[in-house]
Regions:
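Sequence termini and other peripheral, non-core segments
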Residues: 1-42
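Internal catalytic-core helix/loop-beta-alpha segment
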Residues: 127-161
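Juxtamembrane loop segments immediately following a transmembrane helix
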Residues: 175-195
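Interhelical loop segments of eukaryotic multi-pass membrane proteins
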Residues: 2, 42-48, 68-122, 192-194
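Juxtamembrane membrane-interface segments at transmembrane-helix boundaries in membrane proteins
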Residues: 1-15, 90, 94, 117-136, ...
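Transmembrane alpha-helices of multi-pass eukaryotic membrane proteins
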Residues: 10-24, 44-63, 135-140, 164-173, ...
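Membrane-embedded alpha-helices of multi-pass membrane proteins, especially ion channels
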Residues: 23-39, 59-71, 149-156, 180-187
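Glycine/proline-rich loop-helix segments at beta-alpha junctions forming the active-site rim
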Residues: 155-178, 182
């Protein structure tokens, strides 16, 4: 009986390292910003709340915003073929993203650093490589809803809100993040059959 373990398939490449460094730099940016914007007498709890929500906003704007940018502005022309719909299309046959039947949109067709980041992510879930309408609709909500709300929470911390608005909006945002993540997870299970 052979008990030899198979070699690991974990690959740490340049894209992975740059992606992790990008996320770490956003966290460091949030921390340094807290040092400048919060009074030195701010409690540790409020400083952590500020850092967390600023980090959340930066993730929404920088990383998820780059996903939306790639979905709307990065594309490849579909060669004329008899394959209909095109095998790489993430939309129904009669649905053409942005009205172009001859284009496929998404990071899968880009060469920028952010496109490479999303190409890596798409290896685990192909919806993130193209223009999946459900993912785009969720990301529009996070970039234009959750991101600004996270900044508003940071502003309430900075002002020293005593009226309870801080905790109300922090609870609203946390609930939205939890439900959004769960919805996306369930949708992925429904489409792939994997849990």
């Amino acid at each position: 009986m052979d008990t030899q373990e198979s070699p690991s398939t974990l690959v740490i490449d340049q894209t992975t390292i740059l992606s992790l460094l990008a996320a770490l730099s956003l966290l460091v940016t949030a921390y340094i910003t807290s040092l400048y914007l919060l009074h030195s007498s701010a409690t540790t709890k409020l400083r952590v709340i500020f850092i967390w929500h600023l980090f959340d906003a930066l993730i929404h704007f920088v990383l998820e915003g780059s996903f939306l940018y790639n979905c709307f502005f990065t594309f490849t022309a579909i060669p004329h073929s008899t394959d209909y719909p095109h095998p790489a299309s993430l939309t129904s046959p009669a649905v053409h993203f942005l009205g172009y039947a001859d284009r496929l949109y998404g990071s899968q067709y880009g060469t920028s650093l952010t496109a490479k980041l999303w190409q890596e992510y798409a290896k685990a879930d192909r919806r993130w490589g193209g223009a999946d309408l459900t993912v785009i609709s969720l990301e529009l909500l996070t970039v234009f809803g959750a991101g600004p709300l996270a900044l508003w929470i940071c502003e309430l911390v900075r002002r020293g809100d005593k009226a309870g608005r801080l905790w109300f909006w922090a609870s609203v945002l946390a609930t939205g993040e939890l439900y959004g993540g769960e919805f996306n997870r369930r949708l992925s299970i429904d489409r792939t059959g994997l849990s």
